[in-house]
Amino acid sequence: MYLFHLCLVFACVPCPTVQASKLCLGWLWGMDIDPYKEFGSSYQLLNFLPLDFFPDLNALVDTATALYEEELTGREHCSPHHTAIRQALVCWDELTKLIAWMSSNITSEQVRTIIVNHVNDTWGLKVRQSLWFHLSCLTFGQHTVQEFLVSFGVWIRTPAPYRPPNAPILSTLPEHTVIRRRGGARASRSPRRRTPSPRRRRSQSPRRRRSQSPSANC
């Protein structure tokens, strides 16, 4: 995707598409573009997670294909997360083709290794982060992922003697965190079930007959 925009810019074709390509490549001119801002997150929060936290790219691609193949290949717009996953998959496919082309045209094995490692450590990491983030938002919910990133960021920046030994875990986060709304009120997750009150046991003694009034006997 980015290679397409680069070719249009370098070719200097006088058409509106070039202007759009320059906007898409705004990061080349030092623009602060954070693709996670519209989802309530940021690169900074994701960078708190260690590099080995994100699964392998092949595993992420297989997961996205197994869960959302119909939505990703269809024409309809499902959600911004599906669109972001599409873009990440297309970007990684183009980078894979670029690496294959360089591997076949560069004779020096040392240079090939340096280029492949650089792509995996930079763009490969960004694609892994993007796929993990959007797949997690679709699986656990965007708000839950935001809470996890904030909790992990606070945990990792807290000195070891003053923090819990285990880091927050995304899959168990909703069970252990208390989300507070404005005004200090706690957000209720699910209504509590009221335990049924025990029924009163009827007395086994026979009922007393009402005494008849004297007027009734007359």
From Swiss-Prot:
Post-translational changes noted in the entry: Phosphorylated.
Maturation-removed propeptide residues: 190-218
Subcellular location per the Swiss-Prot or TrEMBL entry: Secreted; Host nucleus
Any one annotated GO CC term: host cell cytoplasm
Sequence segments annotated as region (HBEAG): 26-28
Example GO BP: viral penetration into host nucleus
An MF annotation (GO) of this entry: RNA binding
Residue windows of the Sequence repeats: 190-196, 197-204, 205-212
Biased composition (Basic residues): 180-211
Subunit (UniProt): Homodimerizes.
Protein name as catalogued: External core antigen
